[in-house]
């Protein structure tokens, strides 16, 4: 009998099911992992060998290993901590204790991104102008006006669980160990920017610094502020019909992530279409009786100074953007495939920093985070992988306060005192010039003091005669709760764990996850206001108490789906589900209906899901990242009919479009792209102009514009024009396109309308220098993961 046991055990080992785990994983982070530039390298933008060593991978759609325990050089910065850096400089940190592990993460991140950490803490505390000059004063004002005081941040940090606070302290201590190291006289590891900007000595890192970065990311990256004020101005200029045409409450034919067969998730349960019609009339009447001219003049002045939306400079350091992701379920083999490409632009260094962690509490964890935040934002452990895209739902509202005095206002029939304080901002002319950070010298050194106020609704953003605009945030004071949910996500072992974690996050980042059992899911979490039923959510509300929120949407009612019958999910910042409304349009592209850019992903992912594999899933980005997303879905019959009808050079324009496959990246021997590229870009612009002409010039703000990450995407106005205009308009647009391109290229021959392929100018968060990247509509960082047995 005893001799039988070894045989039985051996047989059991052979017949046991394979261990569920990460089977394959790869990623790319262009231009590179590091942001370190030496003192000697400031002039040339050089330093670490890992500043730009992933550009070649990205440009050729190649990837580096994203699995655990890659070989590399080992460093032991202190007892209990080891750091192994692979051939691309990505650190894998192992700690004898959880404290040791997170100390090591802080130490390694500081090695790679110490000056970026400095920029992040200054941006989020309103202190950029102290080192970068007076051109950042407006951004510093926004950071202090719309966010929190030091005591408020400290109070929020005191509320997070003790184990997470301990992790933050370990991360802080690791950063400070590196600061102490580089602060030694003559140390060659000191980043050159600190010397060039005379930003010495380096202040110790604090838990408050980490808290401020976490607050900013949770509040701003998922959605940012709303468009109520531009919407109100557009409504006044073009009238109700034009406004409703370009910014409906719901867009017909919109593409959603949760399949309609899997459920409907109303953003405002209990609100009827009749309520919405009454609310639209009521809000228009309120705005007609309210003089916002002096308030809007103030807003316009700030916009002119910042060169864009208020806070544009702040978001250049900590940006907001779009992103894409998908997951495919292989039920037959109990496998799942996930791909994610968060799109936040490209800079040197990137917003994201990559690392791997091994600790007693978290044996295997790998992915990216923002420098300064002690968790893996996006990545995988050995059982679950996950990705994010910006949710872009409307989680804040603008209130028009009835001002009764310099710092008083009326609310619910009573005069109330604003909560006001003085904030002093120091600024100085920087001693050196980094073009991507310091565009002009601005005013010489000095200081200014600003009065910052809040009402019952929130921060007062603009004031005028008799009115003030205050913004109410659903997430106010609760941003750091997201850290709890993301930590649970880091620890998740099954999709059910991800589902539970999503009940704790307060930010509006879409999540798609996959696990080693082959399960997948999608969530659109966050704190979503239940708005007043009979007021228009697209426009400012009266602040006198008539239009208060009814509460928050229950977490169980937010859009989500697990293992949809179709076997896949995908999101490219499109609406999450049926029943969801457009809000004030924090992202205009959400209004583009059936021509939203996600359509190409839905088509490609559905095809790959018929025969699921890691290779098929990973190849999707080669097509979606090089194709003008809407072009494959344009009505080609309408193009042919328009060609027969067109005159002048119109037929040649339409022939060029019909001959093109939508690829904007393939070049000829001269480095130029297909004539269809310039033709398509001009044609849809001309179509939009035809659509907007009878509406009025002010309609342009509602039509929107494409962002740097989506250069070949379409605007809301172009989408509406392509979907609704007829053959005659197509023919007119083609003729206008021919005239424009003939003048631009000096020839009416469409075959000569070839332009150089577009490049993406890599920004800088410091002195680093990077070559431009070939433009693809791809992620700042991309990961592909296969899980199963």
Regions found by a protein language model. Give the residues of each.
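Bacterial N-terminal signal peptides
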Residues: 6-15
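Sec/Tat signal peptide C-region and signal peptidase I cleavage site
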Residues: 16-20
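Substrate-recognition/specificity elements adjacent to catalytic centers across diverse enzyme folds
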Residues: 21-337, 342-348, 360-362, 367, ...
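Terminal end segments
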Residues: 47, 51-54, 582-647, 728-789
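Second-shell loop/turn segments in exported
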Residues: 101-105, 150-166, 470-473, 484-489, ...
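Compact, glycine/acidic-enriched structural inserts
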Residues: 120-122, 361-441, 486-489
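Hydrophobic alpha-helical segments
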Residues: 461, 469, 507-608, 679-691, ...
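Alpha/propeptide regions of enzymes that mature by internal proteolysis
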Residues: 482-504, 601
């Amino acid at each position: 009998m005893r001799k039988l046991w070894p045989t039985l055990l051996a047989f059991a080992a052979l017949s046991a099911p394979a261990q569920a785990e990460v089977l394959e994983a790869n990623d790319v982070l262009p231009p590179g992992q590091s942001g370190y530039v030496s003192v000697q390298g400031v002039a040339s933008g050089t330093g670490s060998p890992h500043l730009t060593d992933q550009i070649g991978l990205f440009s050729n759609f190649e990837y580096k290993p994203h699995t655990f325990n890659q070989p590399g050089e080992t460093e032991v910065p202190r007892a209990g901590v080891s750091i192994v850096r692979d051939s691309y400089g990505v650190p894998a940190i192992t700690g004898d204790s959880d404290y040791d592990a997170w100390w090591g993460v802080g130490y390694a991140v500081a090695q790679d991104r110490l000056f970026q950490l400095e920029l992040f803490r200054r941006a989020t505390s309103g202190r950029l102008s102290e080192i970068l000059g007076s051109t950042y004063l407006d951004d510093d004002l926004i950071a202090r006006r719309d966010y929190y005081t030091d005591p408020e941040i400290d109070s929020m940090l005191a509320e997070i669980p003790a184990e997470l606070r301990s992790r933050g302290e370990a991360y802080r201590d690791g950063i400070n160990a590196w600061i102490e190291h580089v602060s030694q006289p003559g140390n060659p590891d000191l980043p050159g920017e600190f010397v060039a900007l005379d930003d010495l000595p380096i202040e110790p890192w604090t838990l408050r610094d980490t808290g401020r970065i976490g607050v900013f990311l949770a509040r701003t990256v998922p959605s940012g502020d709303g468009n109520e004020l531009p919407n109100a101005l557009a409504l006044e200029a073009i009238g109700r019909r034009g406004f409703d045409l370009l910014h409906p409450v719901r867009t017909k034919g919109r593409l959603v992530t949760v399949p309609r067969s899997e459920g409907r998730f109303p953003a405002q349960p209990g609100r009827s279409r009749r309520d919405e019609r009454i609310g639209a009339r009521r809000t228009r009447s309120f705005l007609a009786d309210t003089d916002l001219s002096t308030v809007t003049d103030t807003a316009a002045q700030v916009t002119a100074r910042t060169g864009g939306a208020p806070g544009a400079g702040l978001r250049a350091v900590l940006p907001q953007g779009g992103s894409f992701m998908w997951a495919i379920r292989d039920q037959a083999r109990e496998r799942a495939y996930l791909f994610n490409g968060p799109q936040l632009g490209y800079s040197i260094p990137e917003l994201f920093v990559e690392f791997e962690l091994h600790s007693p509490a978290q044996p295997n964890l790998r992915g990216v985070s923002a420098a300064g935040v002690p968790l893996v934002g996006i990545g995988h452990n050995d059982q679950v992988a996950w990705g994010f895209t910006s949710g872009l739902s409307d989680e804040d509202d603008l209130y028009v306060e009835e001002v009764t005095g310099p710092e008083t206002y009326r609310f619910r029939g009573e005069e109330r005192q604003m909560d006001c304080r003085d904030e002093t901002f120091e600024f100085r002319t920087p001693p050196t010039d980094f073009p991507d950070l310091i565009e002009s010298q601005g005013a010489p050194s000095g200081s200014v003091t600003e009065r910052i106020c809040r009402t019952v609704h929130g921060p007062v953003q603009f004031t005028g005669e008799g009115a003030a605009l205050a913004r109410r945030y659903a997430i106010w004071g609760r941003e750091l709760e997201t850290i709890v949910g993301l930590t649970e996500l880091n620890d998740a072992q099954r999709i059910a764990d991800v589902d539970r974690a999503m009940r704790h996050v307060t930010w509006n980042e879409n999540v798609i996850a996959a696990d080693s059992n082959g399960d997948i899911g999608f969530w659109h979490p966050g704190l979503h206001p239940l708005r007043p039923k009979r007021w228009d959510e697209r426009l400012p509300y009266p602040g006198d108490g008539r239009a208060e929120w009814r509460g928050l949407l229950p977490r169980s009612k937010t859009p989500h789906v697990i293992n949809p019958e179709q076997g896949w999910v995908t999101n490219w910042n499109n609406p999450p589900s049926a029943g969801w409304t457009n809000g004030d349009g924090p992202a205009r592209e959400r209004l583009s209906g059936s021509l939203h850019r996600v359509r190409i992903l839905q088509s490609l992912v559905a095809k790959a899901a018929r025969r699921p594999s890691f290779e098929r899933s990973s190849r999707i980005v080669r097509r979606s990242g090089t194709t003008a997303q809407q072009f494959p879905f344009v009505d080609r019959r309408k193009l042919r009919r328009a060609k027969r009808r067109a005159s002048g050079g119109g037929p040649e324009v339409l022939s060029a479009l019909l001959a093109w496959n939508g690829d904007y990246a393939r070049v000829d021997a001269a480095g130029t792209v297909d004539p269809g590229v310039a033709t398509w870009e001009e044609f849809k612009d001309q179509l939009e102009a035809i659509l907007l002409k009878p509406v009025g010039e002010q309609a342009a703000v509602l039509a929107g514009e494409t962002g740097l990450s989506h250069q070949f995407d379409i605007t809301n106005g172009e989408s509406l024009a392509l979907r609704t205009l007829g053959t005659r308009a197509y023919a007119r647009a083609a003729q206008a396109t021919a005239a424009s391109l003939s003048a631009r290229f000096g020839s009416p021959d469409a075959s000569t309308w070839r332009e150089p392929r577009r490049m993406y100018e890599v920004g800088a968060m410091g002195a680093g220098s990077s070559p431009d990247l070939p433009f693809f509509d791809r992620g700042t960082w991309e990961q592909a993961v296969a899980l199963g047995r």
